[in-house]
Amino acid sequence: MRIAVGLGKEGGEERLERQGISRRDFMKFCTAVAVAMGMGPAFATDVAAALTGRRPSVVYLHAAECTGCSEALLRTYQPFIDTLILDTISLDYHETIMAAAGEAAEEALQAAVNGPDGFICLVEGAIPTGMDNKYGYIAGHTMYDICKNILPKAKAVVSIGTCACYGGIQAAKPNPTAAKGINDCYADLGVKAINVPGCPPNPLNMVGTLVAFLKGQKIELDEVGRPVMFFGQSVHDLCERRKHFDAGEFAPSFNSEEARKGWCLYDVGCKGPETYNNCPKVLFNETNWPVAAGHPCIGCSEPNFWDDMTPFYQN
């Protein structure tokens, strides 16, 4: 995988042509992003303009997490992440996929953070604050200090995944590392991260948030810091099984005849009525989403869901 570094001088059309990406495929992707943003397919050209402009420097930091959010982002489609997104943005630091290691990686991070044109910072993972922040180290520095030194310098900060947004499973009771989300840790430093939660979040929500920033669009947030364009409706209201809920038709168990008929999964634990996300609308990999596949929503985009939504298979 080739990762572009630095602000590119070539135009967007040239980059697409060099990567062998047809305009048709590119516009199909832009249409999907526009729809996910609630703008409608007519705004695909605006998304395309944002993605083919001058490449912004992006720094992607990891804290206490499982890397599932990165795995989800790497599986964005039409075109795939390695042929479009990493060449549209200049991903200057990402520990999981960058070729550099050790001192070379640290030098790349400092070069991006101190560059003349600024950078956007994405953060995946919760911040361990227990035992004087010593539960998590990278390159001899605590995760807390790394983010403390970098986030206030960023043009924008986006928390990727529920761990970075609200603490996630790291913050589940009894929370032995005193893990916290980004805004809980650094609000006193003036950091106000945009939260894109999920375990993992849909890649279109991640990309759409970046597109909105690149377009200079004002991003309306809900009371827990999520973009309303992606998290403004409940899973319940968007769900294709909603009509069965309204009709009082509930599957009594998994793999029951009623479940196979598409009846509502509320009685087997679905948390869709309490969860705000666009999973039924955008799907994952254009293929499916958990409830359509027969599994109840577990509320993974909500704060404290590991504690508040369990047991997952009861309501």
From Swiss-Prot:
Keywords: 3Fe-4S, 4Fe-4S, Iron, Iron-sulfur, Metal-binding, Oxidoreductase, Periplasm, Signal
InterPro entries cross-referenced by the UniProt entry: Cytochrome-c3_hydrogenase_C, NADH_UbQ_OxRdtase-like_20kDa, NiFe-Hase_small_C_sf, NiFe_Hase_small_N_sf, NiFe_hydrogenase_ssu, TAT_signal, TAT_signal_bac_arc
EC number(s) recorded for this UniProt protein: 1.12.2.1
Protein modification: Predicted to be exported by the Tat system. The position of the signal peptide cleavage has been experimentally proven.
Class in the EC hierarchy, top level: oxidoreductase
Cofactor binding note: Binds 2 [4Fe-4S] clusters. Binds 1 [3Fe-4S] cluster.
Pfam family, one: NiFe_hyd_SSU_C
Cofactor(s) listed in the protein's UniProt record: [4Fe-4S] cluster; [3Fe-4S] cluster
Localisation per UniProt entry: Periplasm
Leader sequence residues: 1-49
UniProt catalytic activity: 2 Fe(III)-[cytochrome c3] + H2 = 2 Fe(II)-[cytochrome c3] + 2 H(+)
Binding positions for [4Fe-4S] cluster 2 per the UniProt entry: 236, 239, 264, 270
Residues engaged in binding [3Fe-4S] cluster: 279, 297, 300
One GO CC annotation: membrane
Subunit structure: Heterodimer of a large and a small subunit.
Family: Belongs to the [NiFe]/[NiFeSe] hydrogenase small subunit family.
Protein name per the record: Periplasmic [NiFe] hydrogenase small subunit
Species: Desulfovibrio desulfuricans (strain ATCC 27774 / DSM 6949 / MB)
